[in-house]
Amino acid sequence: MMGLAKTLLLASQLTAVVVATPTINNDNELTTKWPVCVKPTKVLDERIPTVKRGPVETPLPTQPGMVNNCNKFCWVQAGNKCYQVAMENHISLADFLKWNPGAGSDCRTLWANTYACVGVSKK
């Protein structure tokens, strides 16, 4: 059984999560496909961080080594493989590996939870 102090602490932490997470509706249900804030920051910003890299802004984070002329990006989820990402974006595996050399020639070093390049502009 939890003591009163622990119960109050847990309640205050849960309230902070609900306040900082606008994807929780009035019935305290999470809206699907939206991130949940578990530790609020000083600035709550919904924009995806980007960096200017060539002709377009590149969303962050990315795996090191991505080509500079990338103009189309795909979020790599845990469990994704290079071939799967390439096929879903209608590009060849060879192009995917050329544009994302950090994934390795055998795709063993593809990072999850990063953006990968799935399209390039002509240099």
From Swiss-Prot:
Q: In the UniProt record, does the keyword Signal occur?
A: yes
GO MF, one example? chitin binding
Name of this chain's protein: Secreted LysM effector Lys1
Other known facts: In plants, chitin acts as a microbe-associated molecular pattern (MAMP) that is recognized by lysin motif (LysM)-containing plant cell surface-localized pattern recognition receptors (PRRs) that activate a plethora of downstream immune responses.
The domain of life is Eukaryota
Q: Supply the induction statement.
A: Expressed constitutively with no significant difference during colonization of banana roots.
Q: From which residue to which does any coiled coil extend?
A: none
LysM domain ranges (all copies)? 72-118
* Xref: InterPro entries: LysM1-like, LysM_dom, LysM_dom_sf
Its gene?
Answer: Lys1
What is this protein's function? Might have a role in sequestration of chitin oligosaccharides (breakdown products of fungal cell walls that are released during invasion and act as triggers of host immunity) to dampen host defense.
Family named by the database record: Belongs to the secreted LysM effector family.
What UniProt keywords apply to this chain's record, in alphabetical order?
Answer: Chitin-binding, Signal, Virulence
According to the UniProt entry, the note on domains is: The LysM (lysin motif) domains are small globular domains involved in binding chitin in eukaryotes. Lys1 contains one LysM domain.
**Species name for this entry?**
Pochonia chlamydosporia (strain 123)
Instruction: List the signal peptide residues.
Output: 1-20
